[in-house]
Amino acid sequence: MTATLVLPHELHGDGPHKVIAVHGWLADRSAYAPVLPDLDLASFQYAVVDLRGYGEARDASGAYTTAEGAADVLALADRLGWERFSLIGHSMGGSVVQRVLAAAPERVRRLVGVSPVPASGLPLPPEQWELFAGAAGTPDNRRVILDTTTGGRRPAGWLDRMVRRSVERSDAKAFRAWLDSWAGEDFHDRIEGSPVPALAVVGALDPALSAELQRATWMRWFPNAELVELPSCGHYAMDETPLDLIRVVEDFLRADAENTEDTEDAGAKP
């Protein structure tokens, strides 16, 4: 593994509950842009990151694996002085945040996966593998993936914009390498049985990372797991149903017992 990198990031809010948000395979941190205006920035402080090969880290060298991504997330938490924090990961980012939990379980308050890739990986049939593997150099493949995983219901303009963003804000070589890691690696034995509260949010229109798949993986591995399925939503809840996503995720994060301690600490007088 290469040396850790302090991931490019932006901070939103100044609340006591710290949260690190990790994007998925087809986007950089701008994937979270649709939800940013309506977050509770008094209760939470969000660090939204770019993984290696994406966004401001597009040219960063590395192995482009979920384990490396987790080490980079922990390095950022150290730089920010965040001893404990919650995690949000979308799709591939869901695998990365589960890797963080495996590496440093004592530091994770709550775990959220938005259409998360399971810690067991996501084996793909040959035709699907060809589609995904070819997406690094073929934008049309990315469009097919976007369209399929949102139930074929999204407008052409949105699909085109998402493809442009994906191509512009990712390095093709890194993009292809990330696929081998998130799809092919199985580390679920390292997180199975973790008592950390873990929420999986899925879209009813997503045929790939469905509620059924999460029941067979996420819900079995985490004793304190919750599953929410958003209707009329596919794989990209930040774009498709941003307000519903915010409500579900922030309600889950607020349920942390440590929030009471945070509030008391914030209001304590010297």
Describe the predicted segments one by one.
Residues 8-59:
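Conserved HGGG/HGGXW glycine-rich cap/lid loop of the alpha/beta-hydrolase fold
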Residues 68-84:
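Conserved acidic catalytic loop of the alpha/beta-hydrolase fold
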Residues 87-89, 114:
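Short beta-strand immediately N-terminal to the catalytic nucleophile in serine-hydrolase-like folds
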Residues 89, 93, 97:
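Gly/Ala-rich beta-loop-alpha elbow adjacent to hydrolase catalytic centers
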Residues 98, 102-103, 108-138:
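Flexible "cap/lid" loop of the alpha/beta hydrolase fold
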Residues 122-123, 138-193:
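Conserved alpha/beta-hydrolase catalytic His-Asp/Glu region
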Residues 199-233:
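Conserved loop-alpha-helix segment in the C-terminal half of the alpha/beta-hydrolase fold
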Residues 224-270:
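Catalytic active-site module of serine/aspartate enzymes centered on a nucleophile-bearing elbow/loop
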